[in-house]
Amino acid sequence: MSQESLVLRGTMRAHTDWVTAIATAVDNSDMIVTSSRDKSIIVWSITKDGPQYGVPRRRLTGHGHFVQDVVLSSDGMFALSGSWDGELRLWDLQAGTTARRFVGHTKDVLSVAFSVDNRQIVSASRDKSIRLWNTLGECKYTIQDGDSHSDWVSCVRFSPNNLQPTIVSGSWDRTVKIWNLTNCKLRLTLAGHTGYVNTPAVSPDGSLCASGGKDGVILLWDLAEGKKLYSLESGSIIHSLCFSPNRYWLCAATESSIKIWDLESKSIVDDLKVDLKQESEMSSEGTASGKNKVIYCTSLSWSADGSTLFSGYTDGLIRVWGIDRY
């Protein structure tokens, strides 16, 4: 059986600060959208043209602070962003303009998501609340106090499982919570982390949830029953997690590297580290930032066909990895 590993295919350079989120198109088209602490969102065309893997097609501006998250509608027509300015924005990508502003959170918005049918939007904030909106920018429900998180809500996701419509949230209170989307009531609290949770990820079939954060441990949960299945040690703070769309793999962006696990064997498929020397040889302009700065990955997204892993870093670069068989 052939082994698989990932190789650096190229980089994408336009952001001037941390790349906080990457959204890839559901139809595997040549567009990706990224958000950054430079307060902008960039729409890219993937060209696969030598070391410069893609070119910035449009820069979307309007947020007054770091843009922390961005997602795409399934038809690729709209992007949705959340910012430390406390707002969400819905962007018309054809026009390059803000179609809607969502105002209601009282502190930084840390995470946004679209439901599978794109008709509902969920957001998470440092104000410790989760808000459910329609696409007109009207807040339909606020989850706060009571069963809600007792600290910043760092990440929120819809489960792709339509039979049991669910919102999954992760928080600095060290828990992951599962909410019933139909009535916004708490279904389960998943406790086990010893530090804040940065990111829950839901598997493509909606059966599994992976969570990670400060303690460097990834916990795998059965989403239906809320049972902890097993844990994976990453060794350093986890900033982002994502499941491969077509392999039984989980990727973790940690402070030391990007680690990819095969969940069947629970073994590491690859451990991706940045090689600045190799990159300056690949690119004509050399590396933009200081040679000795600690650079780590803050955002991850697979292409829809699972062949390409896009990773965003603290130096503003997007590094693009492709699967090699050997």
From Swiss-Prot:
Family of this protein: Belongs to the WD repeat G protein beta family. Ribosomal protein RACK1 subfamily.
CDD domains found in the cross-reference section: WD40
Organism: Nicotiana tabacum (Common tobacco)
Membrane-traversing stretches: none
Primary role: May have a role in cell division.
Domain of life per record: Eukaryota
One annotated Gene Ontology cellular component of this protein: ribonucleoprotein complex
Keyword Ribonucleoprotein included in the entry's annotation: yes
Disulfide bond positions: none
Tissue: Predominantly expressed in roots. Also found in leaves, flower buds, shoot tips, stems and young seedlings.
GO biological process: negative regulation of translational frameshifting; rescue of stalled ribosome
Tagged with keyword Ribosomal protein: yes
Keywords for the protein's UniProt record, in alphabetical order: Repeat, Ribonucleoprotein, Ribosomal protein, WD repeat
First and last residues of every WD repeat: 14-45, 62-92, 104-134, 148-180, 192-222, 233-262, 292-322
Coiled coil start-end: none
Name by which UniProt lists this protein: Small ribosomal subunit protein RACK1
Any one GO molecular function term: translation regulator activity
